[in-house]
Amino acid sequence: MSKKDYYKLLGVDRNASTDEIKKAYKKLALKYHPDRNPGNKEAEEKFKEITAAYEVLSDSEKRAGYDRYGHEGASGGFDFSQGFGSAGDFSDIFNDFFGGEFGSSSRSKAKRSTTGVPGADLRYDLEITLEDAFKGIQAPIHYVTNVKCDMCQGRGSEGATKPVQCHTCQGSGRIRTQQGFFTIERTCTTCYGEGEIIQNKCKKCNGSGRRRDEVNISVSIPKGIEEGAKVRVSGKGEAGAKGGKSGDLYVYVKITPHKIFTRNKADLHCKVPIRMTLAVLGGEIDVQSIDGAKIKVKVPEGTQTSTKLRCKEKGMPYMNSYARGDLYVQIIVETLNPNNLTKKQIELLKALEEEENASIQQQSEGFFSKVKKK
C-alpha cells in the first residue's frame, strides 16, 4: 500500500480536531467499506488507506509522531497482511463504531450458531398422468436423505450426556483478536461456531445428529395442477445437524403427454375425424371427456376441416376451485378412399360429380353472358 498523506486521504486539514477526523473517516468508511463494494478491489484498497490514516490521526501520540517525522514516526498500525476475510467479520468490527450499520452483533451470531445447522431443501421430480392431474391424487414418494438419528434423537451425544461449553470461545462461538485499532472477530475453530462441544459422540451418527436413510411418504397432489408446478412439503427435506431445523421437500410435477388431449391451462383440445357426409349434412358425434364421460357434440351443416367446436366446462378443473375449463374439439373431415367404397357408392359419387359439374357449367355460362352484355 502506497504511503499517501493521511490528512489528504481523510480530506481534512492538518489542524483538524479529533471529532472532525472521526466524522471524515466515518463518511469515507461508509463509502468504501467492502460490504458495500463487493468485489471492488479499488474500494478495498481505498478503505485500507483511510483506515490506516484514521488509526494514526485519531491517536494523539501517533499523530504527533506523524506530524513531526511522517510515516516513520507513526509507530504501530493495523496489520492488513491477512486481508479482509469474509464480509461477516467486518460486520462485527464496525458494529460498535457505526451502531450496527454493517450487520448483527457478535452476540446474536453466537446465539444463532447454537441452534444447529439447518437442513437443506430437497427437490423431487414426480411424473403423473393427465387423469391424475384432473382428479388429484395421493402420490407415494421415495427418496434417500439425511434423517434425524433415531439413537440420539438428533442431539449428537450418547445417552443422556449433553454438550459442554467450548473452552476456547467460552460458548460464544466467536474468537476475538486485537490488531492495532481493530478487534477482529472470527468463527471459533474448535467448535466451528457452535459454542459447545460434544464429548461423548453418538456412535451411530458420530455426533452429527443425523444419518443417511430412506424416506417413504405420501404427498397430496391437488386436482388441476399444471405442468412444472411444485408442491411444498414442510419439514421433509434434509434433517438439520446438531438439532437444526429440517429443510423442506419440493415436489415438481411433470405430466405425461396424453394420447388424445393436449392442454392449455384449464382448457383441453382434441382432434376428432368425421365422415365427409356428416360434415356436409350435419349431425352429432360422441366425444369422450377426460373424466371418461360421453359428450354429445353437435356438428353444424357444412362444417369444414379444422373447425373447433367448444364444449363448455368439460376441460380441466381450476386449482382450488370447482370451476372447469372448456374442451375444444377440432374437426378433421376425412377424404373418402375409393378402395373402401362399394360399387353403388362409387356410382352415387359419380352421379353427384355430374350434377355438380352441370351446376358449375350453368353458373359459368351465366357469368360469361353477363360479362358479354357489359
Curated annotation (Swiss-Prot):
UniProt-recorded Gene Ontology molecular function terms: ATP binding; heat shock protein binding; unfolded protein binding; zinc ion binding
Extent of the signal sequence: none
Residues given in the record as Zn(2+) 2 binding sites: C166, C169, C188, C191
Keywords: Chaperone, Cytoplasm, DNA replication, Metal-binding, Repeat, Stress response, Zinc, Zinc-finger
Names of the cofactor(s): Zn(2+)
Main subcellular location: cytoplasm
CXXCXGXG motif repeats by residue range: 149-156, 166-173, 188-195, 202-209
Binding site for Zn(2+) 1: C149, C152, C202, C205
Protein's GO biological process: chaperone cofactor-dependent protein refolding; DNA replication; protein refolding; response to heat
Localisation: Cytoplasm
Membrane-crossing segments per the record: none
Cofactor note: Binds 2 Zn(2+) ions per monomer.
Domain annotation J: ranges: 5-70
Subunit structure: Homodimer.
Domain notes for this protein: The J domain is necessary and sufficient to stimulate DnaK ATPase activity. Zinc center 1 plays an important role in the autonomous, DnaK-independent chaperone activity of DnaJ. Zinc center 2 is essential for interaction with DnaK and for DnaJ activity.
Functional description taken from the UniProt entry: Participates actively in the response to hyperosmotic and heat shock by preventing the aggregation of stress-denatured proteins and by disaggregating proteins, also in an autonomous, DnaK-independent fashion. Unfolded proteins bind initially to DnaJ; upon interaction with the DnaJ-bound protein, DnaK hydrolyzes its bound ATP, resulting in the formation of a stable complex. GrpE releases ADP from DnaK; ATP binding to DnaK triggers the release of the substrate protein, thus completing the reaction cycle.
UniProt-recorded name of the protein: Chaperone protein DnaJ
UniProt lineage: Bacteria, Pseudomonadati, Pseudomonadota, Alphaproteobacteria, Rickettsiales
